[in-house]
């Protein structure tokens, strides 16, 4: 009898504990800690991602150009068979899935003090460069309806001339931000040198003028990249342990124990 009573009491206590736990749990808290809202994102980390995405996009497009010009091995003799619908998928995804949403997230955090002017200046310049590269590669691309999935789940393409105008507008915004920017240490290309970033922006404007036939404007453009010290280069690191900051080809071939 005592044993039965003991088990009965244990059952009652366990049931009461479960009931109390259910009452105190936040069952309606559906926030995913692994999917933070844009306003909670770290602007410096967003900038890092934009810079790395830009690097990958430009490497993809530069390889395509090198292969077409036979500067690099194309892997075949027939152009049509080597360059299909996925040729610019890397740059396409970097722009629409990565860079543009990240720029929007940084803009949400940029207050009246304009403390993220440098972040926005260089990010918009890189976005404009990829936009022009995609137009040069495939022609019309989504722009006016892009990155608005609620209203345009399947965005239509915009005329290439409209996209180029949009890229030039982004470059104007980049110039405005950079002129008021305080350099940061998270610049993986120019090390926070706003002057060189302005030259980069002006060089892209000059290139756009050449592409669109504004030769007089291109000839009149000043403040462009015209010396080796203003050359735009991505600065890889030397760290082997994760995160491995070395060049991917170097990382795949060399370890502390020697060559692979």
What is each model feature region?
Residues 72-185:
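Conserved, well-structured interaction surfaces
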């Amino acid at each position: 009898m005592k044993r039965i009573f003991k088990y009965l009491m244990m059952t009652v206590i366990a049931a009461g504990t479960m009931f109390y736990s259910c009452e105190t749990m936040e069952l309606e808290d559906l926030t995913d800690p692994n999917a933070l809202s844009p306003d909670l994102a770290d602007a410096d980390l967003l900038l890092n991602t934009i810079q790395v995405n830009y690097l990958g996009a430009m490497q993809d497009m530069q390889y395509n150009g090198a292969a077409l010009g036979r500067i690099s091995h194309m892997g075949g003799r027939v152009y049509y068979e080597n360059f299909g619908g996925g040729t610019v998928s890397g740059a396409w995804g970097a722009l629409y899935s990565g860079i543009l949403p990240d720029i929007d997230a940084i803009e949400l955090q940029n207050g009246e003090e304009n403390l993220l002017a440098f972040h926005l200046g260089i990010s918009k310049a890189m976005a404009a460069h990829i936009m022009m590269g995609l137009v040069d590669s495939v022609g019309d691309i989504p722009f006016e309806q892009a990155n608005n999935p609620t209203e345009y789940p399947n965005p239509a393409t915009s005329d290439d001339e409209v996209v180029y105008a949009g890229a030039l507008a982004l470059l104007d915004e980049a110039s405005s931000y950079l002129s008021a920017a305080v350099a940061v240490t998270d610049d993986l290309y120019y090390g926070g040198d706003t002057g060189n970033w302005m030259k980069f922006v002006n060089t892209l404007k000059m290139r756009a003028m050449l592409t669109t036939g504004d030769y007089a404007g291109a000839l009149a453009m000043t403040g462009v990249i015209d010396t080796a010290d203003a050359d735009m280069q991505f600065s890889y690191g030397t760290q082997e342990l994760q995160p491995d900051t070395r060049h991917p080809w170097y990382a795949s071939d060399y370890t502390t124990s020697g060559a692979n």
